[in-house]
């Protein structure tokens, strides 16, 4: 069984640190950086989870901008999240989809986080179905 994941890939970034003082500019902690962790989110996380189950899987690359969700954790407490949301062009993605041969795949998993990749989902599904793939 071969699976393709198509959707909004998000980058999840975690900034970990500690604090021993408050900023003089505003009543917020000054975070001393300890560690930064970056991982895939959105459709990328769906891909990673299926891959961990030994599924023969690929991630559809759209060359579209990716949203980045940065979370700041200080002394074990979630302080804030900074979103750098990128919107993809659904029509550009549809053109890319229509230039792709989906016949090697048994399943195509659509993962929509409302970032634009699947704005044309109806047409994407219609095209993929012509290859006999099951769309989830």
What are these regions (language model features)?
Residues 21-25:
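Flexible glycine/proline-rich, aromatic-decorated loop/lid segments
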Residues 1-20, 34-136:
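Ribokinase/PfkB-type carbohydrate-kinase core domain
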Residues 27-34:
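Divalent-cation-assisted or electrostatically stabilized phosphate/pyrophosphate-binding catalytic cores
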